[in-house]
Design a protein with these regions (language model features):
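A conserved structural/catalytic subdomain of Rossmann-like adenosyl-cofactor enzymes
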Residues: 1-185
């Protein structure tokens, strides 16, 4: 393995990476923590971007597995070329499936399959902020904290937050000061 860890999901991903032959392709279902976990997770993600073409991540909705609340993704990658860009399809935000009444069926993924095959971005911050298909360059991913692949842009209920990280931090600081002042009174 690339790195020792007791995390079974990370070990499974490492196993898949090592077993794949040059030119081989894989689609692996993994929980969210693989996308953002620090330490071994970050090391494995960097290796995945460097030695493989991680070209697509499909964010799955909750309710499709027997264990309730499981958040999972499908990582699509091939061995041989480094990653240049990653396409994300958010099939989680505002999507509800259950095993009993609204099962995930093939036709629910028709839009994803079309986007996957055509590689035309549907997200546009001005004209279509709810677009579920969006790409990021590998440089944008590497610049993220811990090389996190846990990316969302569609807000629950259709709200899109376009603020920068600096604006968000300033807002949090301002609200924190307001709360501190209120508590002190």
């Amino acid at each position: 393995f690339y790195v020792e860890t007791k995390n079974n999901q990370l070990n499974f991903l490492q196993h898949m990476m090592l077993m794949l032959k040059t030119g081989g392709r894989a689609a692996v279902v993994l929980p969210d923590n693989v996308l953002f976990e620090a330490g071994a997770g970050e090391t494995i993600r960097k290796r995945l971007l460097q030695d493989f073409n991680l070209h697509t991540i499909l964010r799955l909705p909750t309710g499709i597995f027997y264990a309730q609340g499981v958040k999972a993704n499908v990582l699509f990658f091939s061995k041989g070329q480094p990653t240049k860009e990653i396409w994300f399809y958010d099939y989680r935000t505002d999507i509800k499936h259950t095993l009993a009444t609204n099962k995930l069926e093939r036709h629910h993924l028709d839009d994803f399959v079309s986007c996957y095959n055509n590689r035309i971005e549907t997200y546009d911050s001005e004209n279509n902020p709810q677009g579920r298909w969006r790409k990021y360059s590998v440089d944008e991913i590497i610049a993220r904290d811990k090389t996190s692949l846990d990316i969302t842009w569609i807000r629950q209920g259709g709200e899109v937050d376009e603020r920068s990280l600096a604006e968000l931090m300033a807002d949090i600081k301002n609200k924190s000061q307001t709360i501190s002042t209120a508590v002190a009174e």
